[in-house]
Amino acid sequence: STAQLRAIDSADIAAIDTSDLGALNSAQIRALSTAQIDALTTTQLTSLGSADLQALTSAQLRVLSTDDLNSLTTEQFAAFTTSQVNSLTTGQVQNLESADLQALSTAQVRALTTEQIVAFDSADIGALTSGQFAALSTAQLRAIDSADIAAIDTADLGALGSAQWRAFTTAQIDALTTSQLTSLGSADLQALTSAQLRVLSTDDLNSLTTEQFAAFTTAQIASLTTTQAQNLESADIQALSTAQARALTTEQVAAFDSADIAALTSGQFAALTTAQLRAIDSADIAAIDTADLGALGSTQWRAFTTAQIDALTTT
Protein backbone atom coordinates (compact mmCIF):
# COMPACT_ATOMS: atom_id res chain seq x y z
CA SER A 1 0.00 0.00 0.00
CA THR A 2 1.02 3.65 -0.18
CA ALA A 3 1.44 3.66 3.60
CA GLN A 4 3.78 0.70 3.40
CA LEU A 5 5.85 2.40 0.71
CA ARG A 6 6.19 5.54 2.80
CA ALA A 7 7.38 3.37 5.68
CA ILE A 8 10.50 2.31 3.78
CA ASP A 9 13.54 4.00 5.29
CA SER A 10 15.13 6.51 2.93
CA ALA A 11 18.48 4.82 3.53
CA ASP A 12 17.07 1.64 1.99
CA ILE A 13 15.59 3.21 -1.15
CA ALA A 14 18.78 2.61 -3.15
CA ALA A 15 18.33 -1.12 -2.61
CA ILE A 16 15.09 -1.23 -4.61
CA ASP A 17 15.61 -2.97 -7.95
CA THR A 18 14.77 -0.94 -11.06
CA SER A 19 12.25 -3.58 -12.14
CA ASP A 20 10.52 -3.22 -8.78
CA LEU A 21 10.31 0.55 -9.26
CA GLY A 22 8.85 -0.06 -12.69
CA ALA A 23 6.09 -2.13 -11.14
CA LEU A 24 4.80 0.79 -9.09
CA ASN A 25 1.71 2.65 -10.28
CA SER A 26 1.21 6.42 -10.34
CA ALA A 27 -0.48 6.56 -6.95
CA GLN A 28 2.37 4.63 -5.39
CA ILE A 29 4.99 6.92 -6.98
CA ARG A 30 3.17 9.97 -5.65
CA ALA A 31 3.07 8.38 -2.18
CA LEU A 32 6.85 8.37 -1.85
CA SER A 33 8.16 11.11 0.44
CA THR A 34 10.52 13.80 -0.84
CA ALA A 35 13.27 12.22 1.27
CA GLN A 36 12.68 8.89 -0.46
CA ILE A 37 12.71 10.51 -3.91
CA ASP A 38 15.91 12.32 -3.00
CA ALA A 39 17.45 8.95 -2.06
CA LEU A 40 16.88 7.43 -5.51
CA THR A 41 20.10 6.71 -7.40
CA THR A 42 20.72 7.99 -10.92
CA THR A 43 20.45 4.39 -12.15
CA GLN A 44 17.01 4.13 -10.60
CA LEU A 45 15.95 7.49 -12.02
CA THR A 46 17.06 6.64 -15.55
CA SER A 47 15.01 3.44 -15.39
CA LEU A 48 11.74 5.30 -14.88
CA GLY A 49 9.23 5.33 -17.70
CA SER A 50 7.16 8.27 -18.89
CA ALA A 51 4.18 7.34 -16.72
CA ASP A 52 6.42 7.08 -13.66
CA LEU A 53 7.98 10.47 -14.31
CA GLN A 54 4.64 12.12 -14.97
CA ALA A 55 3.39 10.76 -11.64
CA LEU A 56 5.96 12.78 -9.69
CA THR A 57 4.52 15.71 -7.76
CA SER A 58 5.98 19.21 -7.88
CA ALA A 59 7.40 18.74 -4.38
CA GLN A 60 9.05 15.48 -5.38
CA LEU A 61 10.52 17.01 -8.53
CA ARG A 62 12.00 19.94 -6.67
CA VAL A 63 14.22 17.71 -4.51
CA LEU A 64 16.01 16.25 -7.54
CA SER A 65 19.58 17.49 -7.78
CA THR A 66 21.30 18.82 -10.89
CA ASP A 67 23.00 15.45 -11.33
CA ASP A 68 19.64 13.69 -10.97
CA LEU A 69 17.99 15.79 -13.66
CA ASN A 70 20.97 15.64 -15.99
CA SER A 71 21.07 11.85 -15.64
CA LEU A 72 17.68 11.65 -17.34
CA THR A 73 17.60 11.04 -21.07
CA THR A 74 16.15 13.65 -23.40
CA GLU A 75 13.19 11.31 -23.97
CA GLN A 76 12.55 11.22 -20.23
CA PHE A 77 12.86 14.98 -19.93
CA ALA A 78 10.46 15.47 -22.81
CA ALA A 79 7.94 13.29 -20.95
CA PHE A 80 7.43 15.81 -18.13
CA THR A 81 4.09 17.59 -18.15
CA THR A 82 3.90 21.36 -18.57
CA SER A 83 2.94 21.63 -14.90
CA GLN A 84 6.03 19.71 -13.90
CA VAL A 85 8.31 21.88 -16.04
CA ASN A 86 6.67 24.93 -14.53
CA SER A 87 7.38 23.62 -11.02
CA LEU A 88 11.16 23.26 -11.40
CA THR A 89 13.21 25.60 -9.25
CA THR A 90 15.32 28.33 -10.84
CA GLY A 91 18.40 26.47 -9.58
CA GLN A 92 17.32 23.32 -11.39
CA VAL A 93 16.47 25.15 -14.61
CA GLN A 94 19.72 27.08 -14.56
CA ASN A 95 21.72 23.86 -14.57
CA LEU A 96 19.86 21.90 -17.23
CA GLU A 97 21.96 20.49 -20.05
CA SER A 98 21.53 21.98 -23.52
CA ALA A 99 20.24 18.67 -24.86
CA ASP A 100 17.48 18.60 -22.23
CA LEU A 101 16.46 22.17 -23.06
CA GLN A 102 16.29 21.35 -26.75
CA ALA A 103 14.17 18.29 -25.96
CA LEU A 104 11.41 20.46 -24.50
CA SER A 105 8.29 20.72 -26.63
CA THR A 106 6.95 24.15 -27.52
CA ALA A 107 4.18 23.60 -24.94
CA GLN A 108 6.77 22.82 -22.26
CA VAL A 109 8.83 25.86 -23.21
CA ARG A 110 5.79 28.08 -23.02
CA ALA A 111 5.15 26.68 -19.52
CA LEU A 112 8.46 28.06 -18.23
CA THR A 113 7.98 30.87 -15.73
CA THR A 114 9.58 34.26 -16.23
CA GLU A 115 11.67 33.53 -13.12
CA GLN A 116 13.00 30.40 -14.79
CA ILE A 117 13.80 32.33 -17.97
CA VAL A 118 15.64 34.99 -15.94
CA ALA A 119 17.74 32.20 -14.42
CA PHE A 120 18.92 31.04 -17.86
CA ASP A 121 22.49 31.96 -18.79
CA SER A 122 23.76 32.66 -22.30
CA ALA A 123 24.45 28.96 -22.96
CA ASP A 124 20.84 28.12 -22.08
CA ILE A 125 19.48 30.89 -24.31
CA GLY A 126 21.78 29.80 -27.11
CA ALA A 127 20.53 26.21 -26.78
CA LEU A 128 16.89 27.05 -27.50
CA THR A 129 15.73 26.16 -31.00
CA SER A 130 13.92 28.41 -33.47
CA GLY A 131 10.68 26.54 -32.84
CA GLN A 132 11.02 27.07 -29.11
CA PHE A 133 11.78 30.78 -29.56
CA ALA A 134 8.71 31.18 -31.74
CA ALA A 135 6.63 29.67 -28.92
CA LEU A 136 7.84 32.06 -26.21
CA SER A 137 5.33 34.53 -24.84
CA THR A 138 6.05 38.24 -24.81
CA ALA A 139 6.51 38.09 -21.03
CA GLN A 140 9.04 35.28 -21.39
CA LEU A 141 11.00 37.19 -24.04
CA ARG A 142 11.15 40.28 -21.85
CA ALA A 143 12.52 38.08 -19.05
CA ILE A 144 15.68 37.22 -20.99
CA ASP A 145 18.64 38.98 -19.42
CA SER A 146 20.04 41.69 -21.70
CA ALA A 147 23.50 40.19 -21.16
CA ASP A 148 22.29 36.99 -22.84
CA ILE A 149 20.68 38.59 -25.92
CA ALA A 150 23.87 38.25 -27.97
CA ALA A 151 23.65 34.46 -27.55
CA ILE A 152 20.42 34.24 -29.56
CA ASP A 153 21.03 32.66 -32.96
CA THR A 154 20.02 34.73 -35.99
CA ALA A 155 17.70 31.94 -37.13
CA ASP A 156 15.95 32.11 -33.76
CA LEU A 157 15.47 35.87 -34.13
CA GLY A 158 14.02 35.27 -37.57
CA ALA A 159 11.41 32.97 -36.04
CA LEU A 160 9.93 35.74 -33.90
CA GLY A 161 6.69 37.48 -34.82
CA SER A 162 5.94 41.20 -34.79
CA ALA A 163 4.30 41.13 -31.34
CA GLN A 164 7.32 39.34 -29.94
CA TRP A 165 9.70 41.91 -31.40
CA ARG A 166 7.71 44.76 -29.92
CA ALA A 167 7.86 43.03 -26.53
CA PHE A 168 11.63 43.38 -26.23
CA THR A 169 12.81 46.07 -23.85
CA THR A 170 15.00 48.90 -25.12
CA ALA A 171 17.88 47.41 -23.11
CA GLN A 172 17.46 44.11 -24.95
CA ILE A 173 17.32 45.82 -28.35
CA ASP A 174 20.42 47.80 -27.45
CA ALA A 175 22.18 44.50 -26.65
CA LEU A 176 21.68 43.08 -30.17
CA THR A 177 24.94 42.62 -32.07
CA THR A 178 25.49 44.03 -35.55
CA SER A 179 25.42 40.45 -36.91
CA GLN A 180 22.01 39.95 -35.37
CA LEU A 181 20.74 43.28 -36.69
CA THR A 182 21.92 42.63 -40.24
CA SER A 183 20.07 39.30 -40.21
CA LEU A 184 16.67 40.91 -39.62
CA GLY A 185 14.08 40.84 -42.35
CA SER A 186 11.74 43.65 -43.37
CA ALA A 187 8.90 42.42 -41.15
CA ASP A 188 11.22 42.24 -38.14
CA LEU A 189 12.52 45.77 -38.70
CA GLN A 190 9.05 47.19 -39.27
CA ALA A 191 7.91 45.64 -35.98
CA LEU A 192 10.35 47.76 -33.97
CA THR A 193 8.76 50.54 -31.95
CA SER A 194 9.97 54.13 -31.98
CA ALA A 195 11.47 53.68 -28.51
CA GLN A 196 13.32 50.56 -29.62
CA LEU A 197 14.65 52.27 -32.75
CA ARG A 198 15.95 55.25 -30.83
CA VAL A 199 18.35 53.12 -28.76
CA LEU A 200 20.20 51.89 -31.85
CA SER A 201 23.67 53.39 -32.07
CA THR A 202 25.24 54.94 -35.15
CA ASP A 203 27.18 51.71 -35.72
CA ASP A 204 23.96 49.70 -35.38
CA LEU A 205 22.12 51.77 -37.98
CA ASN A 206 25.08 51.91 -40.33
CA SER A 207 25.45 48.12 -40.13
CA LEU A 208 22.06 47.75 -41.82
CA THR A 209 21.99 47.25 -45.56
CA THR A 210 20.32 49.82 -47.79
CA GLU A 211 17.54 47.27 -48.41
CA GLN A 212 16.94 47.00 -44.67
CA PHE A 213 16.96 50.77 -44.24
CA ALA A 214 14.49 51.15 -47.08
CA ALA A 215 12.15 48.74 -45.24
CA PHE A 216 11.52 51.14 -42.35
CA THR A 217 8.08 52.71 -42.26
CA THR A 218 7.65 56.47 -42.58
CA ALA A 219 6.68 56.61 -38.90
CA GLN A 220 9.92 54.85 -37.96
CA ILE A 221 11.99 57.26 -40.07
CA ALA A 222 10.30 60.21 -38.38
CA SER A 223 11.06 58.71 -34.96
CA LEU A 224 14.85 58.65 -35.40
CA THR A 225 16.73 61.06 -33.18
CA THR A 226 18.54 64.01 -34.73
CA THR A 227 21.85 62.36 -33.78
CA GLN A 228 20.84 59.18 -35.58
CA ALA A 229 19.72 61.13 -38.65
CA GLN A 230 22.89 63.21 -38.60
CA ASN A 231 25.11 60.13 -38.69
CA LEU A 232 23.37 58.15 -41.41
CA GLU A 233 25.58 56.96 -44.24
CA SER A 234 25.05 58.55 -47.66
CA ALA A 235 23.98 55.18 -49.10
CA ASP A 236 21.25 54.85 -46.47
CA ILE A 237 20.00 58.37 -47.14
CA GLN A 238 19.86 57.66 -50.87
CA ALA A 239 17.98 54.41 -50.17
CA LEU A 240 15.07 56.33 -48.65
CA SER A 241 11.93 56.35 -50.75
CA THR A 242 10.33 59.68 -51.55
CA ALA A 243 7.69 58.89 -48.91
CA GLN A 244 10.40 58.23 -46.34
CA ALA A 245 12.27 61.40 -47.31
CA ARG A 246 9.06 63.38 -46.93
CA ALA A 247 8.59 61.82 -43.46
CA LEU A 248 11.82 63.35 -42.15
CA THR A 249 11.13 65.94 -39.48
CA THR A 250 12.39 69.49 -39.86
CA GLU A 251 14.64 68.82 -36.84
CA GLN A 252 16.18 65.86 -38.64
CA VAL A 253 16.72 67.87 -41.82
CA ALA A 254 18.25 70.71 -39.81
CA ALA A 255 20.66 68.17 -38.27
CA PHE A 256 21.90 67.08 -41.70
CA ASP A 257 25.36 68.30 -42.62
CA SER A 258 26.50 69.21 -46.13
CA ALA A 259 27.41 65.58 -46.93
CA ASP A 260 23.90 64.45 -45.99
CA ILE A 261 22.30 67.20 -48.09
CA ALA A 262 24.55 66.33 -51.02
CA ALA A 263 23.55 62.66 -50.71
CA LEU A 264 19.87 63.38 -51.36
CA THR A 265 18.74 62.47 -54.86
CA SER A 266 16.77 64.68 -57.23
CA GLY A 267 13.68 62.55 -56.63
CA GLN A 268 14.02 63.00 -52.89
CA PHE A 269 14.54 66.76 -53.24
CA ALA A 270 11.42 67.01 -55.38
CA ALA A 271 9.47 65.24 -52.60
CA LEU A 272 10.58 67.56 -49.78
CA THR A 273 7.97 69.80 -48.23
CA THR A 274 8.42 73.55 -48.05
CA ALA A 275 8.99 73.23 -44.30
CA GLN A 276 11.73 70.66 -44.85
CA LEU A 277 13.45 72.85 -47.45
CA ARG A 278 13.40 75.84 -45.11
CA ALA A 279 14.99 73.62 -42.43
CA ILE A 280 18.17 73.11 -44.47
CA ASP A 281 21.02 75.02 -42.87
CA SER A 282 22.14 77.93 -45.05
CA ALA A 283 25.71 76.69 -44.66
CA ASP A 284 24.72 73.47 -46.46
CA ILE A 285 22.91 75.07 -49.42
CA ALA A 286 26.09 75.05 -51.51
CA ALA A 287 26.17 71.25 -51.26
CA ILE A 288 22.91 70.87 -53.20
CA ASP A 289 23.57 69.48 -56.67
CA THR A 290 22.35 71.58 -59.59
CA ALA A 291 20.24 68.65 -60.81
CA ASP A 292 18.54 68.56 -57.41
CA LEU A 293 17.80 72.28 -57.60
CA GLY A 294 16.36 71.70 -61.05
CA ALA A 295 13.93 69.14 -59.61
CA LEU A 296 12.32 71.74 -57.33
CA GLY A 297 8.97 73.28 -58.17
CA SER A 298 7.96 76.92 -57.97
CA THR A 299 6.34 76.58 -54.55
CA GLN A 300 9.47 74.94 -53.20
CA TRP A 301 11.67 77.73 -54.55
CA ARG A 302 9.49 80.35 -52.93
CA ALA A 303 9.83 78.51 -49.61
CA PHE A 304 13.57 79.15 -49.36
CA THR A 305 14.60 81.82 -46.88
CA THR A 306 16.54 84.85 -48.06
CA ALA A 307 19.56 83.49 -46.19
CA GLN A 308 19.33 80.24 -48.13
CA ILE A 309 18.99 82.07 -51.46
CA ASP A 310 21.97 84.20 -50.54
CA ALA A 311 23.97 81.01 -49.90
CA LEU A 312 23.48 79.70 -53.44
CA THR A 313 26.72 79.56 -55.42
CA THR A 314 27.15 81.17 -58.82
CA THR A 315 27.67 77.74 -60.33
Q: Where are the language model's segments positioned?
A:
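General marker for long, soluble alpha-helical cores
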Residues: S1-T315
